């Protein structure tokens, strides 16, 4: 069985590449999709296309709405959503994506350091698995696709 997997969450490390490379190396039948992961492009898309704003709020609002087109589609079309909460920044968008996945009845896997367990207890409670490393996620994907 082939799966569509959406990789959501922090954009400051190469965790997505680790998971995609791990799945490819094992020959897993998975098609991955992601949000826009170039930070500057994601932050500036609204003003780059629709024009400058005097307020940071409206600049961010434009970008968030345009980025949401891809994010919403990615989550809706996924069989599994993988959401990473990184250590450096508070990823409110990752928590929002987890909420969307849960509301849509999507299976999702969360990755975060143990220190975040209390803060993310509600997010974790709805997750099908809570991992701390990309390698653990690859092992989960291997199990669900190969039964090994």
Regions inferred by a protein language model and the residue ranges of each:
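Conserved catalytic or regulatory cores that recognize and/or transform ribose-phosphate-containing ligands
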Residues: 1-148
């Amino acid at each position: 069985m082939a799966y569509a997997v959406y990789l959501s969450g922090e954009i400051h490390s190469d965790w997505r590449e680790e998971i995609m490379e791990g799945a490819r190396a094992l020959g897993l039948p998975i098609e991955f999709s992601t949000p826009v992961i170039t930070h500057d492009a994601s932050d500036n898309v609204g003003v780059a296309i629709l024009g400058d704003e005097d307020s940071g709020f409206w600049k961010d609002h434009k970008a968030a709405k345009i980025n949401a087109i891809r994010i919403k589609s990615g989550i809706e079309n996924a069989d599994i959503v993988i959401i990473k909460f990184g250590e450096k920044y508070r990823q409110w968008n990752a928590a929002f994506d987890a909420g969307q996945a849960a509301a849509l009845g999507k299976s999702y896997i969360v990755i975060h350091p143990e220190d975040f367990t209390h803060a993310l207890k509600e997010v974790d409670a709805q997750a099908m698995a809570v991992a701390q490393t990309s390698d653990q996620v690859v092992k989960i994907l291997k199990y669900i696709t190969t039964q090994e």
